[in-house]
């Protein structure tokens, strides 16, 4: 038996039930996981399962693509060598509650308690790349029909218990709840509970629509950011228009995807590495970028074809009971390293302009985003949403070294928040599947939360799809998009953590410099593998 791990060019062999000496390194890796005192038994099981997936021979790809992946230009996000589940799944939970489930032997929900109980059950049957659901639903829309004569106090107590249950039984900060844009008791209660508990999980997005959402509700959401760096605030009209209505959700870290569908795979391109291989700006746009775009398309097609044609995933109960539709899944076309790409291309021209610091450099970045959007829109894929992939400014992973997530400005060199927004807002129109800029704000904003409210409204009015901020003194912060506690990172090496994303945060803090984000006073004018 041949085992390819983790690089497709590294081959080891099984001989009957015993292992040859060449497997000692692989065995040692398994043993390291099994004896790692920082991991719980469940976390060890998950990592060992990932190692097993990595031993499956990689699906057929061209030598050019294999070389691009080996060189770090293109990355498959460690999703496994033979995909058997989509990366992100967004079931229609409202439909589930209204019809019940034959597979789960559940009748339709009749009241609030039924609804919470049924959601608690189905969440354990929704797969994702992390094995924990990344989408828990637009919970106010899902739960409001079942409120009945519940008092505010009763709703608060039940939702608080529900929130604690989510963090303790599904401890992964990629798990995401959506609320808003309407004003209702579920939305306000979730904001209250989230601010009180300050949990890593679940992640939370508040949908904002200027024509629907009252200012005092947005103020409650931005006050929460001051207290616990949540929620993430999404520009509802822009997202809804991108999907022809309201059938979408925000999941994981800033991924906007079709409801009752999701993402079959996420592949990403390192723009820094692409720019390195270009002789000039013209060469970048005319030759190098289109070449790697075709390789990106090849990898998305290879991975999604295996999932849709060989894994049998879409024969399961989620599809059979109408909670997801195969046609509503699409590959995510991720990019990162925009800052480094722009700076490298300008250096090749002998220019000293820097991304995020002057209009000339920023304009080049916007041109790259526009070109990527045209390439993605003009290129059909085998299993896409209406035949297309979805462009996404990918938020980075814990293993990234010397490269900035998505189109963000480099850590530690950010200008004031207003300048930051002005530099990056023009990118947002191009990234249908989501984009993020994490602004780090000085703790003095806590004494002036109106400043956070005004900054948020200004960013959304400038065209931001999503607004996200960390407050410098908060223990609970965003890393690439998921939440971690700085106190957990500090003690992780010695004690481990109950929460699945703490190791990613610890690794990211060490490798990417995320904790070097520059806090700015608002009034100055704004992993995936075991190691």
List where the protein language model places each region:
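Short, well-structured alpha-helical interface segments that form or flank functional binding sites
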Residues: 264, 330-333, 367
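Well-ordered alpha-helical scaffold segments within catalytic/enzyme domains
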Residues: 340-348
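Short secondary-structure subsegments characteristic of cysteine-rich extracellular domains
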Residues: 352-375
């Amino acid at each position: 038996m041949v085992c390819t791990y983790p690089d497709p060019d590294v081959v080891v062999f099984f001989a009957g039930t015993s292992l040859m000496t060449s497997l000692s390194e692989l065995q040692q890796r398994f043993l390291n996981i099994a004896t790692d005192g920082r991991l719980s038994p469940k976390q060890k099981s998950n990592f060992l399962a990932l190692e097993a997936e990595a031993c499956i021979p990689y699906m057929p790809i061209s030598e050019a693509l294999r070389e691009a992946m080996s060189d770090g230009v293109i990355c498959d996000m460690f999703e496994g060598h033979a995909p058997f589940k989509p990366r992100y799944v967004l079931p229609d939970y409202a439909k589930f509650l209204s019809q019940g489930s034959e597979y789960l032997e559940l009748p339709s929900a009749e009241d609030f308690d039924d609804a919470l109980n049924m959601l608690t059950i189905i969440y354990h049957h929704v797969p994702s790349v992390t094995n924990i659901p990344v989408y828990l639903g637009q919970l106010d829309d899902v739960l409001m029909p079942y409120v009945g004569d519940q008092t505010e106090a009763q709703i608060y107590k039940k939702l608080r218990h529900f929130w604690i249950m989510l963090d303790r039984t599904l401890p992964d900060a990629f798990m995401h709840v959506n609320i808003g844009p309407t004003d209702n008791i579920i939305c306000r209660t979730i904001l209250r509970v989230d601010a009180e508990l300050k949990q890593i999980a679940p992640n939370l997005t508040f949908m904002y629509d200027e024509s629907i959402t009252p200012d005092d509700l947005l103020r409650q959401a931005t006050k929460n950011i001051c207290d616990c760096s949540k929620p993430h605030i999404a520009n509802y009209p822009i997202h809804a228009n991108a999907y022809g209505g309201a059938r979408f959700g925000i999941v994981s870290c800033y991924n906007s995807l079709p409801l009752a569908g999701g993402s079959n795979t996420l592949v990403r391109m390192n723009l820094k590495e692409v720019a390195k291989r270009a002789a000039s700006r013209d060469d970048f746009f005319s030759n190098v970028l289109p070449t790697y775009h075709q390789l990106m398309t090849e990898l998305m097609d290879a991975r999604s074809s295996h999932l849709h044609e060989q894994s049998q995933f879409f024969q399961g109960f989620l599809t059979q009971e109408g909670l997801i539709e195969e046609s509503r899944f699409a590959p995510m076309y991720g990019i990162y390293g925009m800052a480094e790409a722009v700076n490298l291309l300008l250096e090749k021209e002998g220019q000293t302009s820097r991304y995020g610091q002057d209009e000339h450099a920023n304009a080049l970045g916007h041109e790259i985003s526009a070109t990527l959007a045209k390439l993605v829109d003009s290129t059909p894929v085998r299993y896409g949403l209406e035949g297309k992939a979805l462009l996404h400014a990918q938020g980075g992973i814990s293993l990234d070294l010397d490269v900035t997530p998505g189109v963000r400005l480099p850590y530690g060199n950010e200008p004031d928040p207003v300048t930051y927004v002005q530099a990056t807002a023009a990118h947002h129109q191009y990234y249908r599947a989501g984009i993020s800029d994490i602004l780090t704000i000085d703790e003095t904003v806590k004494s002036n939360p109106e400043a956070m409210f005004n900054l948020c409204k200004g960013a959304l009015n400038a065209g931001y799809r999503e607004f996200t901020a960390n407050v410098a003194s908060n223990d609970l912060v965003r890393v690439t998009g998921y939440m971690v506690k700085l106190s957990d990172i500090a003690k992780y090496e010695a004690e481990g953590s109950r929460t699945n994303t703490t190791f990613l945060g610890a690794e990211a803090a060490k490798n990417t410099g995320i904790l070097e984000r520059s806090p700015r006073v608002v009034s100055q004018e704004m992993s995936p593998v075991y190691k």
